A protein has these predicted regions:
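Short gly/ser/thr-rich secondary-structure transition/capping motifs
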Residues: 125-129
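Generic enzyme active-site microenvironment
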Residues: 39, 186-187
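Conserved acetyl-CoA-binding loop of GNAT-fold acetyltransferases
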Residues: 90, 203-205
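Glycine-rich beta-strand-to-loop/alpha-helix junction loops that act as flexible
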Residues: 187-190, 208-211
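Conserved N-terminal beta1-alpha1 strand-loop-helix module at the mouth
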Residues: 2-94, 99-107, 114, 122, ...
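Acidic, divalent-metal-coordinating active-site segment for phosphoryl/phosphodiester hydrolysis
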Residues: 190-202
């Protein structure tokens, strides 16, 4: 088992799995629970096949919650969206290395600097088939890594078991480079009460849970149980 020396566990319910016909109530479940983060998936139907919501929705949600807004940009051009989501009330923004590294229209370091200059936490996300090595050179500049444990785009998918080894690899790198107090590992996708402990033991300390929370009979109880693992 990898020793997780990072700060305490963070549960980040993913609003993508919520009932959008009663969004205020769904957000209040999170407000009334022990969670401190709310995960907001932003999709443009280009980088991923789904389309979610934009900065105006985030701005409206901000009026009803003081939680840490963790904005996950699953978009083909994250740089052009940064200002809108910063202004909408994001507290942290993650972008996909696959949308930046390969083409260098806006190199990752430019996005990192812009996010950090706005006094937000900055994360880099990697898809299941993307190796960790591609983001090693950016680790000292960011606050968290998002390990996608499902293919990004849709809620309710099954957890990809190989994600455990990737988390362990990243945790070892973080500890060896003395970045333990700086960089968190977020695991996003297929997180359930029955597998969350394995993810934590592998070294993750931020768990994004969508369907497990919002499709449960008691979302508040589900969040609180996960938070106590």
């Amino acid at each position: 088992m990898v020793t997780n020396k990072r700060k305490k566990l963070v549960i980040a319910p993913s609003l993508l799995a919520a009932d959008f016909s009663d969004l205020k109530s769904e957000i209040n479940y999170c407000n009334d629970s022990d969670c401190t983060w709310l995960h907001l998936d932003i999709m443009d139907q280009q980088f991923v096949p789904n389309l979610s919501f934009g900065p105006d929705v985030v701005k409206d949600i901000r009026k009803h919650s003081d939680l840490f807004f963790d904005v996950h940009l699953m978009v083909s051009n994250p740089f052009d969206m940064l200002d809108s989501f910063i202004d909408a009330g994001a507290n942290g923004i993650s972008f996909h290395i696959e949308a930046t590294e390969s083409r260098f229209t806006f190199p990752p370091k430019i996005l990192i600097n812009k996010i950090k200059r706005a006094n937000l936490l900055c994360g880099i996300a990697i898809k299941p088939k993307t190796g960790f090595k591609i983001i090693e050179k950016y680790m000292e500049f960011i606050d968290y890594v998002v390990v996608m444990s499902v293919e990004p785009g849709f809620a309710g998918q099954k957890f990809i078991p190989e994600s455990i080894d990737k988390i362990k690899e990243i945790r070892s790198f973080i500890d060896e480079k003395n970045l333990t107090d700086q960089v968190s590992i977020q695991c996003d996708g297929g997180i359930k009460l029955h597998n969350a402990k394995d993810v934590i033991n592998a070294g993750a300390n931020v768990l994004v849970a969508g369907s497990e929370v919002f499709q449960s009979e008691d979302p508040i109880d589900t969040i609180n149980k996960m938070n106590q693992l």
